Amino acid sequence: MFQNNPLLAQLKQQIEANKEYVEGTVKASDKAFGFLECDKKSYFIPPMEMKKVMHGDKVKAVVKREDDKEQVEIDSLLEPMLDRFIAQVRFNKDNKLQLIVDHPSIKNIIPANTHKKVTETLESGDWVVAQLKTHPLRDDRFLFAQVTQFICKADDNFAPWWVTLARHEQPREPVANEKSYELHDELDREDLTSLYFTTIDSPSTQDMDDALYIEPIKQGEVQTGWRLVVAIADPTAYIPENSNLEKAARQRCFTNYLPGFNIPMLPRELSDDLCSLVPNEKRPALVGYIETDLAGNITGDTRFVSAWVESKAKLAYDNVSDYLEQVENAWQPESAETKQQIDWLHQFTLARIEWRRNNALLFKESGDYSFELNEDGSVRDIHVEYRRIANQMIEESMIIANICCAKFLADNAKTGVFNTHAGFDPKNLESAQKFLLDTLSTDENRDALTAFYAPEKLATLEGYCEMRRSIDEFPEKFLELRLRRYLTFAEFKSEVAPHLGLGISHYATWTSPIRKYGDMVNHRLIKQVLLGKQAKTVEEGILVRLQEARRQNRLVERDIADWLYARYLFPMVEQAVEFDCEIADVSRGGVRAKVIANGAQIFVPFSTLHDKKEEMEFRPEEIALYIKGEKAYQIGQAVKVKLTEVRLETRSIVGNII
């Protein structure tokens, strides 16, 4: 009798029209309930509704109100949190396969089966890749997954590496070596083997991209400048443009440098041998001749040639730095020619540093952290290394070489893989100006600084550089760290554009073609120009892949480091070790502090900082926490932190500020 009843249909429409729908992301709690995080509000999800979803699911829900209390009833799934995911194996009491998702906030235990292509016998604790097959909201069935790939056994000490690489779908192995490699030369090679090229690198480095030769330019007996000859390994001479090797390099894009070892972009026979500029071996190279005056200004156009070169010496950063810094009992150059090259390159470097200080931007000095590992993958120690003068010598040589490459490609090829950085995100320009004025201005100088930090000026290369130089002497770190949050990301582009982070109008890397696919592309473009050919515009797909691969590699490096830090600090919890730290972030949940000595990040929950929540205020615009109206903690602030907990299963490190 109710079938096709228009009154009933109208009633249903009215009920539906009166429902208040919201969309958001599920946030699980330590209890059975959860929250739906929407754009401007958070709604309570009762335990029965949480059984339909998991942390991270994007859902549509209906708001229910009763006695001034709000909660939601889940309506439908918009996007599941899980698709492909990493998990550890477990078996229930009936020996049925289940998966523990490797995510700190997902507590769901997911029943699973195994795809037929997985041939390993799974045991409790093993690491696997799985695919979510069913979801209660989407398939009207309970959560269920399928194991699609075995990663490693539970007791594999190298699990941090293998699991992380699998998570980000990165290869474990280098590209397989070819049976043989042939040199494909279209350009005649000049014989430059008589020039006294040297390399400066880490003692363990095998894939040496660059070698340098430098000499003074003289008019009569008076020196007027420097001639720097930059020899760069030439892998494109061995790799035909549409070969399988080229395709593999294009997919990987970068050599992946991980704690303990690297995964090269090219086969090791090329990266570590045939292309590497090892000492006393004749190698093909692409060579750039760069000339400057004594103040470091580039004079004239850079000349590129295809050549044969022979490095005469492989030098180590620390040895060269010790020699130049006159450390007691320091290493000494083994020949007069090596000594001359080091001394000349040192003088050239000092001129270029001063040139960049006045005309571009210098890097802020910060240490690089490196893990010293035992053979079984355990962490023996963590070292902080700072750039010394020898590192700066190579750095300055590579920077000027890349500036010259960018100008050459822009002028001649009209395309390239250009490294660009627009500085502040356009939507943050006014916020950046306001922050600078609030921090630096006084009643006397506010009008002048308002013009100096005008948004339209901050958006230009000149204005951005002037701003950065103006804050160089500011003693508080928070100014620099806060401004970083307003920046946009660096991008690869096929047309030349400024790199505001470097303070340079043109920048394109070509100095690491063994390690970076974009540099290989630029090598091919330089060669096309030298051959008199019309250069092909760099495909957008290449730029997109470079951007994605760079992001993936950074995530891989970060995730492995997080795991190794947790392992390293875990034994120290009982000792309640205290660390000197710097606040790296302040968020709604707490403070994240970086340990100065080793780079580990320790989370300090807000609940440990003050016992009255209502007296605490997080101010995101300052990245600061206020207690009772007074600023208590801010990004960049020095603090002392006591280690209190390390959770190995989630790789989280927790402490208290003391």
UniProtKB/Swiss-Prot annotation:
<dbReference type="InterPro" id="IPR050180">
    <property type="entry name" value="RNR_Ribonuclease"/>
</dbReference>
<keyword id="KW-0269">Exonuclease</keyword>
<dbReference type="Pfam" id="PF00575">
    <property type="entry name" value="S1"/>
</dbReference>
<dbReference type="InterPro" id="IPR004476">
    <property type="entry name" value="RNase_II/RNase_R"/>
</dbReference>
<keyword id="KW-0963">Cytoplasm</keyword>
<keyword id="KW-0694">RNA-binding</keyword>
<dbReference type="InterPro" id="IPR013223">
    <property type="entry name" value="RNase_B_OB_dom"/>
</dbReference>
<feature type="domain" description="RNB">
    <location>
        <begin position="189"/>
        <end position="530"/>
    </location>
</feature>
<keyword id="KW-0378">Hydrolase</keyword>
<dbReference type="InterPro" id="IPR003029">
    <property type="entry name" value="S1_domain"/>
</dbReference>
<dbReference type="InterPro" id="IPR011804">
    <property type="entry name" value="RNase_II"/>
</dbReference>
<dbReference type="GO" id="GO:0003723">
    <property type="term" value="F:RNA binding"/>
</dbReference>
<dbReference type="Pfam" id="PF08206">
    <property type="entry name" value="OB_RNB"/>
</dbReference>
<keyword id="KW-0540">Nuclease</keyword>
<protein>
    <recommendedName>
        <fullName>Exoribonuclease 2</fullName>
        <ecNumber>3.1.13.1</ecNumber>
    </recommendedName>
</protein>
<dbReference type="InterPro" id="IPR011129">
    <property type="entry name" value="CSD"/>
</dbReference>
<dbReference type="Pfam" id="PF00773">
    <property type="entry name" value="RNB"/>
</dbReference>
<comment type="similarity">
    <text>Belongs to the RNR ribonuclease family. RNase II subfamily.</text>
</comment>
<dbReference type="GO" id="GO:0008859">
    <property type="term" value="F:exoribonuclease II activity"/>
</dbReference>
<comment type="function">
    <text>Involved in mRNA degradation. Hydrolyzes single-stranded polyribonucleotides processively in the 3' to 5' direction.</text>
</comment>
<dbReference type="GO" id="GO:0005829">
    <property type="term" value="C:cytosol"/>
</dbReference>
<dbReference type="InterPro" id="IPR012340">
    <property type="entry name" value="NA-bd_OB-fold"/>
</dbReference>
<feature type="domain" description="S1 motif">
    <location>
        <begin position="576"/>
        <end position="658"/>
    </location>
</feature>
<dbReference type="GO" id="GO:0006402">
    <property type="term" value="P:mRNA catabolic process"/>
</dbReference>
<dbReference type="InterPro" id="IPR001900">
    <property type="entry name" value="RNase_II/R"/>
</dbReference>
